[in-house]
């Protein structure tokens, strides 16, 4: 494999973009601080309580708040894409040897990698402060389940970045982030919603991300329905992302 192959170019661009993202300390703090603080607050209130289905309330909250922080990190990477489009960097890349598909894959990889601080720190707080007790295998399985379940949100960040402008991408990202988090049951149990809202919640990818993580952390295996729904969202958003990317290239 030479340094000019699409795979090598994708990896190199993803590495450079990830380094730039991790240098943005403000971005990292904002995507980690709120979910971590909320988890610590609620974990102290509900310590020792049982959520049912082999799950403690603290473990339930740990998955919810980790998902909350990770979704925010993934979606908000769209802001950098919008900035790159405004300054002309995106257009320069289109004229380079980097294929469009490699660019999109690299950006999706970056979106996935910037979610790791929120995931790791909330899980670490769960183990140390929250008293969540899992085997090494359970920690690994739960972490991987939540992380891989974030793929549609990484793609959603790309969609927002290519469809929005520098002026609109931040409010769009925030509304989408909070809307998916609340409606998906990351802040409040979906069971507490009115019946019609419960049905709407089950259409959101955030609901199934939380369901995936909670089912795995409870030791009940991987829920097939959650995987299928998240995969479906990934395919739909991927198609929209490709369309938005191509459309953004036609604008001066």
Question: What spans do the regions from the language model cover?
Answer:
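Transmembrane helix-loop junction
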Residues: 43-48, 127, 131, 158-162, ...
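Helix-loop-helix units of permease transmembrane domains in multi-pass membrane transporters
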Residues: 80-112
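Transmembrane helix-boundary elements of multi-pass transport/secretion proteins
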Residues: 2-9, 15-87, 115, 119, ...
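Short, membrane-interfacial amphipathic segments enriched in basic
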Residues: 1-14, 196-206
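Short amphipathic alpha-helical coupling elements at transmembrane boundaries
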Residues: 12, 16-20, 91-95, 161, ...
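Transmembrane helix segments
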Residues: 41-46, 163-203
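Membrane-interfacial helix-loop-helix junctions in multi-pass membrane proteins
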Residues: 51-52, 132-133, 184-237, 251
């Amino acid at each position: 494999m030479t340094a000019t192959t699409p795979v090598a170019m994708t990896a190199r661009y993803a590495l450079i973009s990830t380094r730039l993202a991790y240098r943005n300390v403000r971005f990292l703090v904002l995507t980690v601080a709120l979910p971590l603080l909320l988890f610590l607050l609620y974990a102290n209130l509900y310590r020792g309580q049982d959520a049912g289905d082999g799950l403690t309330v603290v473990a339930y909250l740990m998955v919810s708040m980790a998902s909350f922080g990770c979704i925010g990190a993934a979606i908000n990477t769209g802001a950098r894409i919008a900035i790159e489009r405004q300054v002309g960097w995106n257009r320069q890349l289109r004229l380079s040897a980097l294929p469009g598909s490699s660019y999109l894959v690299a950006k999706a990889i970056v979106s996935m990698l910037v979610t790791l601080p929120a995931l790791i720190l909330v899980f670490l707080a769960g183990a140390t402060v929250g008293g969540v007790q899992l085997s090494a295998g359970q920690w690994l399985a739960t972490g991987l389940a939540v992380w891989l379940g974030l793929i549609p949100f990484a793609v959603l960040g790309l969609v927002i970045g290519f469809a929005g402008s520098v002026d609109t991408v931040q409010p769009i990202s925030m509304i989408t982030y909070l809307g998916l988090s609340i409606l998906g049951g990351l802040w409040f149990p979906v069971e507490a919603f009115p019946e019609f809202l419960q049905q709407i919640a089950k259409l959101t990818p955030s609901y199934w991300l939380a369901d995936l993580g909670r089912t795995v952390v409870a030791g009940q295996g991987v829920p097939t329905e959650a995987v299928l729904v998240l995969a479906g969202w990934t395919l739909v958003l991927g198609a929209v992302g490709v369309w938005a990317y191509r459309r953004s290239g036609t604008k001066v």
